From Swiss-Prot:
Principal location listed in the UniProt entry: cytoplasm
The protein's assembly and partners: Tetramer of two alpha and two beta subunits.
EC top class named in words: ligase
Native source species: Nitrosospira multiformis (strain ATCC 25196 / NCIMB 11849 / C 71)
Protein name according to UniProt: Phenylalanine--tRNA ligase beta subunit
Database matches in SUPFAM superfamilies: Anticodon-binding domain of PheRS (SSF54991), Class II aaRS and biotin synthetases (SSF55681), Nucleic acid-binding proteins (SSF50249), PheT/TilS domain (SSF56037), Putative DNA-binding domain (SSF46955)
PROSITE patterns: B5, FDX_ACB, TRBD
PANTHER family: PHENYLALANINE--TRNA LIGASE BETA SUBUNIT, PHENYLALANYL-TRNA SYNTHETASE BETA CHAIN AND LEUCINE-RICH REPEAT-CONTAINING PROTEIN 47
């Protein structure tokens, strides 16, 4: 919110410098982002009138002007050479006199192409008021000649820009900011006197509110016989421009001015462009299928059923609370108006502007909530200004009122105030602070019942009121103390892991966490994730971030390239984040954990030989995440992974994700010199934790037996391990694979698998015969199920 300091001081004028005023606002929670002067320093510039213009005798693009400046009581015209295209007799412009100091230049009497010039007629750019200008700055015909230009143009002013939080929509108007300044500084606020404008004609336009929940308050009135041949007053144009708005025409300028002054957006329709004119009607309703509208910004919009519109009997005229339509806007030929002031429910407007890809001042205010208690007053204020500037006659106000937001009293206890703030405020002090805030209240027995004003949508609970007291009391006056609130520390369930624990494990195993956008390239989704129906964004940040991700792998690969381009050779990354799927018209979100490994297993060192990371290193990292859960892998295909080096992961019997090396096609496409190992897991499955079971530690020595079996090449190790473990032989404490061999001495269709077994009893020392009997049983199982045989 940008505004003029001088305009603010017409409402409330505290005895504070600009700097102190900005500091006071910031300390009260209304951060002043910037303070800048309206104009740079310059002097000896006055309001002047061009009396005559003649061609320069020696330059086609120059004019020799006689200029009346009235400076220091001198009525003698000055001769000034000017090259501006818009110079002509009769205009009033700023004139820099000889000796004037302008931004970046000094003015002195000189000769230009042989003609004497004793000053300079100025453009807005030359005075530092604009970055660019096409000609002289033209002033109002009634500007008093000889007046110091800085005083006439009110340039002893500063522009303040507030960085408002979303809950403070009440400060999106000068009256709201003035209310805050008055409360902060304990000053009186001067309100604009708004008197109801009496109807001069009986004509009205029928209004039908078909969406009463979305529009619980709507005011409209007819204004006839206006003239747009007049100019918007200079003071209004200045205030608009200093708030970041340009002047368009008197009616539009008035509606914008009242919005800046009160925070209430208004809209004016050309009555002649409404279907049926006075015989027609206005409808506030939701859009119908197939309807469209061309907005004032030139955008053609196909309307959706959740969009609220202002319509006549034939078509939508405006996107309610956001922007008017081009077909019904007020242009230079308008004579009759229909003026609108309304309250639209914030939830109906919120997010619409963003989804459409543009913003508007109206939407910015309505989605935060405007003061429905001032809707009628804003209408009267705009009517009065239009009549004073454009003339005309007005009809009565038609007001349709439905169920407006309730203003239920909020309980505020002094004991709670002291406990939260750490400052003891007595009843009188709290009452004084609430009076400064203009909050209505009743109090009894150290308890206040405060009714939120109609302009404060952010007040709902006791803590909101305590925050208001803290702002008025002064955050800087509250001493630092230890919290006094009671804390109940809940015990974490042992059957659930935490996300922080998952992060700790991976960081301990040399991974670094990354956080990527949830938006990715379309090709990543269709090719890398195998998602043929990605969720497209209506308003993407860029073409490279056009769809929602269903997998985290694309972001990790992008991170890999980023690090490789910066000469990193050993990279381990992980991310925990949301992924999004579309199934028909249904959308779902799933949280996933993904990891990426590239380069050597360990940093280069003298004690260990270099070895590139592989499938089994990543598998070990996943097992560390899951301990003491049971991990199973089974060969499976994934579009991003190597068809012969990828697997599906099951966690305690539930499908949990996948693991494998990056597909050679992608490795070549990305120009990667080494293999990349990737995994992606379902976080919900990871968080479920199997409780460790206590078991007796045997005091008897274990017996180790190693066996090597020949099995068909297509038999997986996992299948063999599952078969041996399924026998549930109590004395077997461990079975592990320690060697795989194919080559000389082994048939081409076979492979040799060597397993280590530890056998141990908790009650006695095992004999060799007992151990051999158990091993023989397992060998028999493998022979029967897989055609395995012992390798001699």
């Amino acid at each position: 919110m940008k505004f003029s300091e001088n305009w603010l001081r017409t409402f409330v004028n505290p005895p504070l410098s600009t700097r102190d005023l900005a500091h006071a606002l910031t300390m009260a929670g209304l951060e002043v982002e910037s303070v800048e002067p309206v104009a740079p320093a310059f002097h000896k510039v006055v309001v002047a009138e061009v009396l005559s213009v003649q061609k320069h005798p020696d330059a086609d693009h120059l004019q020799v002007c006689k200029v009346k400046t009235g400076a220091a009581g001198n009525d003698e015209p000055l001769q000034i050479v000017c090259g501006a295209a818009n110079v002509r007799a009769g205009i009033k412009v700023p004139c820099a006199l000889s000796g004037a100091q302008l931004p970046g230049m000094a003015i002195k009497q000189t000769r230009i192409r042989g003609v004497e010039s004793t000053g300079m007629l100025c453009s807005a750019k030359e005075l530092g008021l604009e970055d660019a200008s096409s000609g002289l700055l033209l002033l109002s015909p009634d500007a008093p000649v000889g007046t110091d230009f800085r005083a006439y143009y009110d340039l002893e002013d500063n522009l303040l820009t507030l960085k408002l939080t979303p809950n403070r929509g009440d400060c999106l108007g000068l009256s709201g900011i003035a209310r805050e300044v008055a409360a902060i500084t304990s000053q009186n606020r001067q309100s604009v006197e708004i008197k109801p404008v009496s109807a001069q004609i009986a004509e009205t336009l029928a209004i039908h509110v078909d969406a009463a929940t979305a529009c619980p308050l709507y005011c409209g009135r007819v204004v006839r016989g206006i003239s747009l041949d007049v100019a918007t007053p200079q003071w209004m144009v200045q205030r608009l421009e200093r708030s970041g708005l340009r002047a368009i025409n008197p009616v539009v300028d008035v509606t914008n001015y009242v919005m800046l002054e009160t925070g209430q957006p208004l809209h004016a329709f050309d009555l002649a462009r409404i279907q049926g004119g006075l015989a027609g009607s206005i409808h506030i309703r939701f859009a119908r299928p197939g309807e469209s509208i061309e907005l004032l910004n030139g955008e053609n919009l196909v309307l959706q059923p959740d969009m609220l519109v202002i319509a006549d009997d034939a078509k939508p005229l405006a996107l309610a609370g956001i922007m008017g339509g081009n077909e019904s806007g007020v242009t230079s030929g308008a004579v009759d108006l229909f003026l609108e002031s309304a309250f639209f429910s914030p939830g109906v407007i919120a997010g619409k502007s963003f989804s459409l890809g543009f913003s508007s001042d109206s939407a910015y205010r309505f989605e935060r909530g405007v003061d429905f208690g001032a809707t009628r007053a804003a209408m009267e204020r705009a009517t009065d200004l239009i009549l004073n500037i454009c003339g005309g006659r007005v009809g009565p106000v038609t007001e349709l009122r439905g169920s407006l937001p309730a203003r239920d009293p909020i309980r505020l206890g002094l004991e709670r105030v002291g406990r939260v703030l750490g400052v003891e405020l007595d009843e009188g002090r709290v009452a004084e602070l609430l009076h400064r805030l203009q909050f209505g209240f009743l109090n009894t027995d150290a308890v206040f019942y405060v009714t939120p004003p109609t302009y404060r949508f952010d007040l709902a609970i006791e803590e909101d009121l305590i925050e208001e007291l803290a702002r008025m009391y002064g955050y800087n006056r509250i001493a630092a103390t230890m919290p006094r609130a009671k804390l109940d520390i809940l015990s974490a369930p042992e059957t659930r892991r935490t996300r922080s624990r998952l992060r700790q494990i991976l960081v301990a195993r040399d991974y670094q966490e990354v956080i990527n956008y949830a938006f990715v390239e379309t090709s990543w989704e269709t090719e890398l994730a195998g998602n043929r129906t990605p969720i497209a964004l209506k308003n993407p940040l860029s073409n490279q971030l056009a769809v929602m991700r269903s997998s985290l792998l694309g972001g990790l690969i992008s991170n890999l390239q980023f690090n490789l381009n910066r000469k990193q050779s050993r990279i381990r990354l992980f991310e925990i984040g949301g992924c999004f799927q579309k199934d028909g018209q249904t959308y779902s979100q799933q949280e996933k954990l993904a990891g990426l490994c590239y380069g050597d297993v360990v940093e280069e060192q003298w004690g260990l030989p270099a070895r590139p990371v592989d499938f089994y290193d990543a598998k070990a990292d996943i097992e560390a995440l899951l301990w003491p859960g049971e991990l199973r892998v089974a060969a499976a295909r994934h579009p991003a992974l190597h068809p012969g080096k990828s697997a599906e992961i099951s966690i305690d019997g539930r499908i949990g994700g996948f693991l494998g090396e990056l597909h050679p096609r992608w490795q070549q496409k990305l120009g990667l010199a080494r293999s990349v190992v990737l995994f992606e897991l379902n976080v919900d499955v990871l968080l479920a934790r199997t409780l460790p079971q206590a078991s007796e530690i045997s005091k008897y020595p274990p017996i180790r037996r190693d066996i090597a079996v020949l099995v068909p090449k297509d038999v997986s190790v996992q299948a063999i391990l599952d078969s041996m473990r399924s026998e549930k032989l109590s004395i077997i404490s461990e079975i592990a694979l320690f060697d795989v061999y194919q080559g000389k001495g082994v048939e081409s269709d076979k492979k040799s698998l060597a397993f280590r077994m530890l056998l141990q009893d908790t009650e006695k020392t095992l004999t060799d015969a007992q151990a051999d009997q158990v091993v023989a049983k397992l060998i028999s199982v493998l022979e029967n199920r897989f055609g395995a045989r012992l390798r001699s």
